[in-house]
Design a protein with these regions (language model features):
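Bacterial N-terminal signal peptides
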Residues: 14-28
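Acidic, small-residue rich beta-repeat scaffolds with periodic aromatic anchors
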Residues: 30-92, 184-259, 322, 329-370
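N-terminal secretory signal peptides
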Residues: 56-57, 66, 252-299
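Acidic/hydrophobic-patterned starts of short beta strands in beta-sheet-rich repeat architectures
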Residues: 67, 133-144, 188-192
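Beta-propeller blade repeat segments, especially FG-GAP/WD-type strand-to-loop junctions
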Residues: 85-88, 150-170, 206-211
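A low-complexity, Ser/Thr/Gly/Pro-enriched, surface-exposed linker/loop concept
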Residues: 101-111, 282-312
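Repeat-based blade/solenoid architectures
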Residues: 103-125, 173-183, 201
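Structural signature of eukaryotic scaffold interfaces centered on beta-propeller domains
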Residues: 126-134, 183-186
């Protein structure tokens, strides 16, 4: 009898212990499931111990609202936290923190501005609410600091769903690795990005949306680092999942570029231009077509050189087995152009229009560059 009572008591105690363990496990699961996802990096301890200001963001949605908790220091970039809430339930949905947020408020309401998106270098607000993947549900971009080009604004991107938001690594990558947030072309249903490196290297990319994700379609790189100052344009295109690349040199009008001589060939209208980019700088020859593509640029390689014979009024240069000659009169006006390939000469006619500049100006510039 005593043993039976002891067994029943032990059984009850074991059952109670089991329920306690189950309760603890259930509590842990609920807590984990309900944990607020936090994105971005910051000195949380320093932020917690510093004076802060709290702002409501401008009303941007019927379903959601947001706040900005930011350092009270009067700095351009300040530590802060953006929180997004469900309006109906009051539940916190997303938290983004950063050591470098910006405070831009509406002077009339005092609320933090939203949906300001002035590309490429203008103001961009801490929250942008727009349909990025063209599925009919608006998405969120929340500033997470100044991680894009030239210490510009960067964003964490959350795609809207029927039940809230989900973080998107692919869209976030586009909002981190370029100059600010991407632009949205709703009519073309495309996403466009831009980035640069100094004055002389620019890259623009266009993405289509497939299955809700961005897919690179075209990418154009303009590189002005060549000695002539003319940009090399490399265009990459997605051809059935494989990127193809074409490279060309592009003629651009530039106020710093001095045109020494310019004339057109007949009947194509192709422009022949001799130019330099400043006093004592090298002289370059460019053959430019109607689409401003440069078919021939000279010099490019080491050892290549333009030569002018004052006695015969001829400017010439050689590339490979081909020699090019521009023949002028005593006043420096071009009268003919010749292309000589392995001893065979082809005469190129000029359009019957006045040339701009002269061979004499080219000759003077060549002397100045020596």
């Amino acid at each position: 009898l005593h043993l039976s009572i002891v067994q029943r008591c032990a059984s009850r105690l074991g059952l109670q212990a089991l329920w306690v363990l189950v309760g603890l496990a259930s509590s842990t699961l609920v807590s984990a499931a309900g944990a607020l996802p936090t994105y971005g990096e910051m000195d949380a301890a320093g932020f917690a111990g510093s004076p802060r200001e709290n702002y409501a963001l401008q009303d941007f949605s019927d379903k959601y609202r947001a706040t900005l908790d930011i350092s009270a220091k009067d700095d351009v970039f300040r530590p802060g936290v953006i929180n997004v809430y469900d309006k109906a339930s009051g539940a916190a949905l997303i938290r983004v923190q950063s050591d470098e947020l910006v405070l831009g408020t509406d002077p009339k309401t005092g609320k933090v501005k939203t949906n300001v998106h002035e590309l490429p270098y203008g103001e961009q607000s801490v929250l942008i609410y727009q349909d990025f993947n063209f599925d009919g549900i608006k998405d969120l971009a929340l500033m997470d600091g100044q991680n894009s080009c030239y210490h510009g604004p960067s964003y964490q991107v959350f795609l809207g769903t029927a039940h809230g938001f989900r973080h998107s690594d692919s869209f976030t990558k586009l909002a981190q690795n370029n100059c600010g947030l991407f632009s949205v072309n709703e009519k073309a249903r495309k996403i466009e990005t831009m980035t640069k490196d100094g004055c002389c290297w620019h890259q623009t990319s266009t993405y289509s949306i497939r299955n809700g994700e961005p897919v690179l379609e075209t990418q154009t790189v303009l590189d002005h680092t060549g000695g002539s100052g003319l940009p090399t344009e490399t265009v990459s295109r997605n051809q059935n999942g494989k990127m193809t690349h074409t490279t060309s040199i592009v003629w651009e009008e530039d106020q710093q570029r001095e045109i020494l001589l310019s004339f057109r060939l007949a009947p194509s209208g192709k422009r022949i231009v001799l130019f330099r980019s400043g006093d004592a700088s090298p002289v370059f020859y460019a053959a430019v077509d109607s689409k401003n593509q440069v078919g021939l640029l000279f010099p490019q390689a080491d050892g290549e050189q333009l030569k002018y014979d004052a006695a015969s009024h001829v400017l010439s240069f050689v590339r490979g087995d081909t020699a090019y000659r521009i023949v002028g009169d005593a006043k420096g006006a071009p009268s003919a152009m010749q292309v000589v390939v392995r001893g065979k000469t082809t005469e190129l006619k000029l359009l019957a229009e006045p040339a701009k500049g002269s061979l004499n100006k080219v000759a003077d510039a060549l002397k100045a560059a020596q």
